[in-house]
């Protein structure tokens, strides 16, 4: 069986979200009339959290490679492309370790 095209899902997404918001709005009005606002506020905050996480997930799906490309540049350097490979050896630190430690009085 043919798999659904990803674009079809994205085209149906706004209608689904608007339908869910419409349903939530009518439920909000019913609960407003019954004065049960704690449940409504909880549902609104939960919906906000879910929509925010969904938005972050979708944005990462679209722009994740671009963001990763900004931080990781393959090349001669080490991690993130800015540190040379031989920089893990710090001879100045080794020489400083051999010196006697100075106190604040000296």
Swiss-Prot record:
Residues 2-8, 65-106 are extracellular. The chain crosses the membrane at residues 9-29, 44-64. It is a multi-pass membrane protein. The keyword Nuclease does not apply. Residues 30-43 are cytoplasmic. The modification N-acetylalanine is found at residue 2. One of its GO terms (biological process) is osteoclast fusion. Glycans are attached at residue 80. It comes from the Eukaryota. Pfam families: T_cell_tran_alt (PF15128). Keywords: Acetylation, Glycoprotein, Membrane, Transmembrane, Transmembrane helix. It is found in: Membrane. One of its GO terms (cellular component) is membrane. Belongs to the TCTA family. May be required for cellular fusion during osteoclastogenesis. This is T-cell leukemia translocation-altered gene protein homolog. It comes from Rattus norvegicus (Rat). The lineage of its organism: Eukaryota, Metazoa, Chordata, Craniata, Vertebrata. The gene is Tcta.
